[in-house]
Amino acid sequence: PLALAPSEVYDDFQKGGCFSGSAIEHDGKLYLVYTGTTNYGDGFIQSQCLAYSEDGVHFEKYENNPIIPHPPEGYDESNFRDPKVWKHGDYFYLVCGSKKNNLASALLYRSKDLKNWEFFNVLAESRGEFGYMWECPDFYEIGDKHVLMFSPMGINERTSVYLVGDMNYDTGKFTYTNVGQIDYGFD
């Protein structure tokens, strides 16, 4: 069966849709966090939404979607997408791509219950060298380091970038010291 399809005002099929996201298990349920996209004629509006499943096959959209209706002030709501969710300590964290003043950002949110989210900090941002938008960000730990990986828009086509550094969960800030490309696109 189809797990997720556009059906609501916040992920309207005719003018937007369900964009990518991620999943996490919590209390015996599988939770999907995804981007709902709609367009009422004046550009895309993107928000972060939640669906859940008891069996991992049949999903129900959360009745109070969107769980994050807008990015923080000054960020582009038509470029606010692709949430990655994980748990650390007592909080769930979510990173999604956005942009402000034509520079890419990875925005960090946190929640105690996956339903009520607060903006925590800008996890990392471009200073101009990594394009104007970061799509499909991923954030994970390897050993004692953290990695932020994304697909930048506005630089070399078909490139994926990774940043390696240290995460401070008290401040919500990621400080990277190493940068690299995952691949160089198609041959």
Language model segments and positions:
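Beta-rich carbohydrate-recognition and catalytic domains
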Residues: 1-82, 86-130, 134, 141-186
